[in-house]
Amino acid sequence: MKTGIIVSRRDSLRFGLLTGASALLPAAARAANARGSNVPPTPVRWIDDAAPPLSLGQTFGVPWPQGALRAGTALSVKDAEGKALPSQHWPLASWPDGSLKWTAHALPAGDTPSASMTVVQGKPVAPPAPVLLRETADRIMITVGLVQWTIGKSGNSIIQSAKAGERTVMGSLALIASVDNAPQGGERSHFTGRIDKATVEQKGPVRAVVKLEGMHEGQGRAWLPFVVRLYAYAGADHLRVVHSFIFDGDPARDFISGLGVRAQVPMDAAPHDRHVRISTGADGLFSEAVRPLTGLRRDPGAAARKAQIAGQAVAIDAMAPTVRNLLDRIPTWGDFTLSQLSADGFAIAKRTKAGQAWIDATSGTRSQGLGYVGSPTGGVAIAARYFWQRHPAQIDIRGADTDQASLTAWLWSPNAQPMDMRPYRDVMGMEAYAAQNEGLDITYEDYEPGWDDATGAARTSELTLWACAATPGAAHLAAMAQANATPPQLMVTPERIHAADVLGIWSLPDRSSPLKARIEDQLVNLVDFYAEEVDRRGWYGFWNHGDVMHTYDEDRHVWRYDIGGYAWANSELSPDLWLWYDVLRSGRARAFRLAEAMTRHTGEVDVYHLGRFAGLGTRHGVQHWSDSSKQPRVSNAAYRRIFYYLTGDERVGDLMRALVPSDQALTHVEIGRKVPGAERKTLPEGVVDFSFGTVWGSLAAAWLTEWERTGDVRWRDRLVAGMDSIGRLKYGWLAGSAPYDLKSGRFIGSGDKISISHLNAVFGAFEVNAELLQLIDVPRYRAAWLDYCRWFNASPQEWDAHFSLPFGKRNLKEGHSRLTAYVARETGDAALSTRAAREFLGGEAGLGLSDGDPRVAHSGPDFVRLTVEWPGVSTNAASQWGLAAIQNLALIPDALEWAAAEKRN
């Protein structure tokens, strides 16, 4: 079978574009690249358009045109003045010819990083104090400058200790959890994380990564499997902590009442030199001492007060005797708590010790989730990202008046109601398929008893842990909190990514005509609308944050949060892809962070990571697991891969790799089991009916990614087997589905019936096919795909003239315009280009292109709050319009202009 690489004239033009890009670089960077061969210079920018005051360390991905970068080529990073920066790089993906397709690059942590950077060919510079990692039989030691972390390889301490200089500033760091056996008033059990496996993934010199895997154990039970990654960067006194866990309990009896990370902090300073700091907002801090010296009846002196407020040691001899002699009469405050039980409110309270009353200290709206306890001789800070967004969260400091304090970042606050993972509804007499289909008909929910199961859902949280040599100043603590809450991110410029010809078909922003400006405006407005709706509608909470709603209720002026299949979107019709393609072309921070939060949600919460549904995701619903339709189209690796390549994120890499064998889940989960009128097929063992788009296309994204990441031709061959066998069917892609042999990876049967679904191409199949056909030459598959693209949106008359078969139902004409545009571009058919442009601008079964900004603000008693509405919007329509706009601008820009002029006339 012939396989190979398709190199088009467009690819050649992109190589020229890359060559021209070097003129935009500093002379030093151009000279460095001149000494190389084909390595194009790569400008890198901060997504916020400005250098941050503090970077906690950076990892970003760089794409390379095919053939431009040989494996093993040394790469360096230079700042805006051409000075080489310490850096580390490694491969992420390869082209079929073995050249590198994506590399990841790490830069140290530090203040005032360069405003812009360039990746060039050349030996990387080592940092002044490289990350040093040493592994023994029972522990892993990481040293960064004066800070040393000792990490356990077994036992209950994720980190055994941390030293700043010669002083141990932190003892054990452990994962903790508690569970109640009833939603209210239940018996509580406590659990601690136990390490079962430790793996060193990187050893420096700029970045080291340790992966820890285990379970939470206690009360004779081991459950809540976890993966924790610890990241150390050169120049840093902190570790990045990425904490992932899977809920593997029984929703009817396991109500998690606390989930967190707890550090033990040695305390030996005088009580008045022990400091507590808790972030209260964007730049606010709650700053107190265990024994306060301010506000007393007697004045200790300005120097003492100033030193305590600044977090510095108080000179006891210089203190006024009227205070110095009565210090033991001033109460010490050992316990502090910030509880963020909603997205819009937190409260801070403190008490002298256990058994005494809590005293309210202050309250506010949105804490950034950083807590610190320590003294002028050292301490520990910890911060949780998405702290208020993923409420209920909490920061606890306990025993600050004793020899050992504890500092806890709660991902689920023990002050909140326990986590309730039960289904939101009961059976309601819907035991049989007939009743279930009636329910689907009225609420759009696919319900089946026992399939609305939360067991197997996961959540990943990101934290930062600092080992501080002294109490940081207020401004630096605020910068630490901000850098954790909204991490600065480097990204290659959109122009350079586009020129590398990666990630399928997409366009750069183009406002060169009134029509294109209207399209660009709507692309910006849509992202802004959804980003703002997250806050207006309160799409927050531990399990909800990152997702958006499916459909709007124009009568109640709310999204349909309580109506069956109209509530949480769960990746329906690819909002993840729309947002990531918007990021690629715009580089906008708002789009990036909206897409990032969605990726963290949809790849974890909406997907099963263990149990009978492992590898499948859940269709849109009131709860993220409530719909009984479990599908590969939701777990889809296509929704994760752009984030992975832009950031090198190891957790997302794990999630995509876990999907590689997920086709096997369909041997015991029949996803089409109750479709009305569906033909029940008796198939041989190991053969499952697959749709080409929503099933095979989703799995193909995982196999494509694994082939790129590993170079293992098994996955290329599996792709080729599927492609070739679809191409051999009588009607190819128009057959819609066919029996699939899991062992050979081939579709079997004749494919002699046409079965068109409007869903088949809108869960990443268009985007994955664009990449497959760029990489693998299977002519009969290409013909089958182009045939589908040509005929999906064809008129009934054209269809009848060609097939003499029933036309059938169609939907999503606007979104499918990009399929018409693709076949037009590939065949050079001007008539199809015009048809595609008319389909897109016609807006049928889609969002439509607005003339101006359609958003309307409302307030008053008919609305819950100040409300902004986009008439006719749904996430399905927004996602497909966004993708069609981005891709049609790349495929048929001239035809769009002609069709717009035709429409005006």
Label the model's feature ranges.
Residues 534-570, 602-715, 730-758, 762, ...:
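Catalytic cores of eukaryotic secretory-pathway lumenal/extracellular enzymes that build
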Residues 127-154, 473-581, 585, 617-620:
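An acidic-aromatic substrate-binding cleft motif
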Residues 474-483, 705-717, 721-732, 736-755, ...:
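Terminal, non-catalytic domain-edge segments
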Residues 2-20:
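N-terminal secretory signal peptides and thylakoid transit peptides that target proteins
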Residues 78-101, 430-442:
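Solvent-exposed beta-strand/loop surfaces of large extracellular or lumenal domains
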